[in-house]
Amino acid sequence: MDITINPRLFYIMVFIPFFLISLAVHEFSHAYFAYRFGDNTAKNEGRLTLNPLKHLDLFGSIIIPAISLLSGFAVIGWAKPVPVNHHNFKNPVRDDIIVSTAGPISNLMLAVLFSILLNYLPSESRLINYLYMPFIFNIFLFYFNLLPIPPLDGSHVLNHLLPPHLKPIFISISRYSLIILMLLIYSPLWKYFLSLIEWTSNLLFAP
């Protein structure tokens, strides 16, 4: 009996493990550096691990990604945020900035790793089709998480860099962060964000 698998379904099945690993590496990086700087919160909650199951968020890691994949849209998703108590840090400002940027930087490192694999593969290799999406996804995670919109990692960095008199204003607008993010996505500015992802992907890998 001949069994054929829908190419799109197979593509999704291949991508899902890369998707979950990318999210797990991101959250593990936050947990690891927080632990190194004296905060055991994530470790005590079992988050100092690369096991994707420990970082899953039902809505952000399963439902939304599944809908976007099945609909043919760009993959959107997130993991359960790692709990961090910056009061446990020896140098709260410096350490929190490093912990916050560790996640996005880990995704950039994964993108570089994927680019090395892609560049070494023969141009006719079918593996390129399956590795290219996690490659792009990790570039997206790198830039997206650096956006200075709460609760994204970039907002932690900006909060530490703002003058004291502006911090209360920044904190007060955090309740509108989802609205701000949606306005950004549907604004003309979003095309510049996507252009940045395209520029980075072409820099690392030119098919």
Set out the residue ranges of the language-model regions.
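Hydrophobic transmembrane alpha-helices and their immediate loop junctions
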Residues: 1-207
